[in-house]
Every structure is written in C-alpha cells, then in structure tokens.
Amino acid sequence: MKKNMKRMMGWIFTAVLICCIGFTIKGVTADAAIVSGGKKNYSYSELQKDLKQLKKKYKNRCQVNVIGKSEDKRNLYEVVIGNPDAKKHLLVMGNLHAREHMTVQLCMKQIEYYLSNYNKKISGKKVSNTLDKVAIHYVPSCNPDGTAISQRGFNAIRNKKLRSALRKMGGSSSRWKANARGVDLNRNWNVAFKTSGRKGSSGYCGPKAESESETRALVKWSNRIQKQGKIVGIVSYHSTGSIIYGKSTSRAPKAVRNATTRMYQTAKSLTGYQLVQHESYALPHGYSRTYYLYKKKIPFITVEVGRGAAPLGGGEFGSIWAKNKNVVIREAQLFQ
C-alpha cells in the first residue's frame, strides 16, 4: 500500500512538473524573437512585418518613420531607438548595395536586441542611459528595389517601364548591386562627382549627383537629423570580405579623423575585421563615405561583414551576428 502511495505521489509530482515546464515554454514562445536569424533572403515584406511588430512591442522605446520612396515606390524606413530629442545622434545605414541584403537582417536583429535589453547592461553600461544621450537612427534597407531584384529577379519590379529597361541592361539579377534604374547608390553622392560606367548591375554613378530618389531621401534624412543635434558618427554596413574602411586623410579635420579611428578600433575589437590600409588623398567620385567624411565632416566607418561573395548564404549569419551584435551600441557608447 505504501509503495503504491509513493508511486502515485511520484506520478502526481511528475505531472505537475510537466505542467510547469509547459507554462515556461509557453512563456518563452510568447516572448520569442521577432526578427529571424540565418535566412538567406530576408525580404522587404518581412522587414515591414517585423517593423510593425517591433513598433507595437516597444512603442515607448522606438519610432518607425518613412523618410522617402525608392524608384519603384517602396518605402525607405527609418527606425529611431532611444531619445529622439537627444543632443547626439548616431546613424546606421544598411543595404546600399542590393545583393548585400543580409545587412538588412543584421540591422533589424541589432535593433531588436538593443530594445529587448533596454534596461540591462552591455559592456558595463546600461543601454537606456546610452540611448538617452545618443539616439540611434537606422535605415536598415537603403535599396529595397535592388534587393527585390537580387532575391526574386527583374519581375519583382512593379513599374513596367523600369522592368523593361532593366531587362536591356547587363548583369545577373541575383548578383545585382544597383537600384531599379541600374545606378550604384554608393556612387551617386554629391562629392567629386563625375559620370562613369553604364547602367547595369554595378559601377554606374548615375547621370548626375543625387539623381536617384533613394540618395536624395538619405541626404534629406541626414540633413534633418543634423538640424536636431550633432551627428557623432555613421556606420554603413556592407557584406564583402570581413574588413573595415576606417582610415581618413588630412582632408578631414583632426577631430573627425580621431573619432573615425576610435570607431574603427571599437568595431575591430569586437569583430576582428581588419582595416583597409589604402586611403587615397584624391577623393573617390560620388561615394557615400567620401560625402559624409570629407564634405559633411562626420566620422564614418564602413563595416564589410561576411567571408564569401554576396549574396551571402544563410549559414554565415550566426558568425556575423556573434561578431556584430554589440557593434552599434558600443559605437554609441563612445560618444555618450
């Protein structure tokens, strides 16, 4: 009888334990991550869905704004985390080059990670304290049309005229770097500009500086923020080679050069990515980094993630995430 009673009590205890574990699992599932990790093709529709959920979940910690439209009329989204009225602002741009679309997913994972750890410490500093002093402004996807081409081909472009013109250009759709008009958005900026190349997957600067709606929207975006306060630095994410462009020449003021060096050293300490040593004194034509570093006098680093050629396979995301998850918040900590 006693043995049966003990056996019964053991069953009851096991059943209660299973129920408790079930509730715990339910709790974890309810608080599961919004932004996926490790997918090869993080799409524009996923970006929109995730932004909507992040805004709903963290409505007091972030803002989602539309700063303009692409040539094929997709929204260019800005995500502001922290105090929008802060005196200092850090800008982050992803996906200027279409096939480097894993940077969209990386930016979105960073946004969620910082928001979910808002009241915790990263590298010994409370995230909320940093973001109260330095607001971070992300544009996760600067080139949504080009990304759609890289992921789904020319048929992803909705405008018939644009789609027809694209088919006449050279270049593989999956390896596409440019926007929907065949213009490289990283070479379309109003600094030492001169037209070179031809419309296609890569290398074409455009008929004139800021000819593309995406470039104009980004310039307007940074100008607006500069009127609100000081832009302390810019991080631009690309995805080729696990390197960092972090050098600058005497064309930039000493304070800007020093801040850029500190930004590079911070990123290198976390990622292990090496510095690109060559930095020509002659201004590269129409580059975004050239524009901000030398014309706008803003510290700027370009972080190239990934080992292989873009578009990167989903299997690379885990390593990229481990190295880069703290990069942007640590850059903000430099200036708080």
Model-predicted segments: where are they?
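Bacterial N-terminal signal peptides
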Residues: W11-T24
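A non-catalytic alpha/beta surface segment that caps or lines the substrate-entry region
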Residues: A33-V79
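Sec-dependent signal peptide cleavage junction
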Residues: I21-I34
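Extracytoplasmic/secreted proteins, especially bacterial periplasmic and envelope-associated proteins
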Residues: Y42, E46-Q53, M102-Y113, H137, ...
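Short beta-strand-to-loop junctions in surface cap/lid or active-site-entrance loops
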Residues: E78-A86, N95
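Loop/turn elements at helix/coil->beta-strand transitions in domains of secreted/extracellular proteins
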Residues: K59-Q63, D72-L76, A86-H89, D132-H137, ...
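Active-site/substrate-binding loop(s) of hydrolase catalytic cores
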Residues: M102, K109-K247, T302-E304
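C-terminal accessory segments enriched in acidic
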Residues: K3-M8, I34-K40, F193-Q336
